[in-house]
Regions:
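N-terminal secretory/targeting leader peptides
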Residues: 1-57, 65-66, 72-276
């Protein structure tokens, strides 16, 4: 098998890539989980705020019964398979204005967010002003002051040089950014059984490598950002952020992600109590 790589949006934005994967015009793509939701709304469960308590929950959500559950949704509803997952850290909050240490500090600030109904609702629940802006335009929007901040993990923050226009980061653990490696179901059906096994195993190996890379390089990127002058703060009141997000966003987005039964099926798959 020969694999050709087309990085940096050469094949269009993520929505276009997902459409091409579904149509069989593109074999594999790595996309942000939020961009899969218009095609498989139950995958939006992964973006519900404070779904995960820690990295153990994140790993359980992307392996074993939980992965099988989500992959089944993707195959039946989306026309693609989830070969594996890439891990890009919590969506920590950065801004250019001031340190954010409590819920009151974020009120009124404008944040770039992806086109995600759940993230939009989450920031509104905290009293911030979320603005959907494409990823390609994020740096310019920050540089020109169109928004005060954004949300992403340390490796991406450093690679995109956001530290040139953002001086404050707050470690808020409300959502973990996952990017599934999706494979066209049409392409998969054309493969021999041996090739299907080979590519499935390769996806699992890539996922394990990505997790190990993230755990090590995320720490290094954090330190490099501190050395570059970025101030990193922890919240004084994350329980209040959690309460605001869960009490407002979960009921509002229940139907959007497939209903309470789907949410509780996923919670059961990662060993959590049902949402009542």
């Amino acid at each position: 098998m020969e694999v050709q790589l087309f990085p940096s949006g050469q094949l269009g934005d993520e929505t276009e890539m997902i459409q091409n994967v579904r149509a069989g015009n593109l074999d594999i793509a790595v996309v942000g989980i939020a961009n899969t939701v218009p095609f498989v709304k139950k995958l939006g469960i992964l973006t519900m705020p404070y779904l995960f308590d820690d990295m153990y929950d994140v790993v359980r959500a992307t392996t074993g019964p939980a992965h099988d559950l989500l992959n089944g949704y993707a195959i039946r509803e989306g026309g693609f398979r989830i070969l594996g997952w890439t891990y890009t850290d919590y969506r920590y909050i950065s801004n250019s204005r001031k340190p954010i240490k409590n819920l009151n500090d974020i009120k009124g600030l404008k944040f770039r967010v992806p086109q995600s109904a759940i993230l939009l609702a989450c920031y509104k629940a905290w009293g911030a002003n979320p603005v959907p802006i494409s990823w390609a335009e994020t740096f310019t929007a920050l540089q020109q002051g169109l928004v005060d901040g954004q949300c992403y993990g340390y490796i991406t923050f450093l690679a995109c040089k956001f530290n040139e226009v953002q001086k404050y980061i707050t470690e808020v653990h409300y959502t973990y950014q996952l990017q599934p490696m999706i494979l066209s179901q049409r392409a998969f059906r054309k493969m021999s059984p041996e090739m299907q096994t080979l590519i499935t195993d390769a996806g699992r190996d890539a996922q394990e490598y990505c997790l190990a890379f993230q755990l090590v390089e995320g720490v290094r990127a954090r330190q490099r950002l501190i050395e570059s002058g970025v101030q990193i703060d922890q919240l004084e009141d994350e329980a209040d952020w959690r309460s605001a997000a869960i009490s407002q966003v979960w009921p509002e987005m229940e139907t959007f992600v497939g209903g309470r039964a789907a949410i509780n099926a996923f919670l059961s798959a990662i060993g959590k109590k049902p949402w009542k």
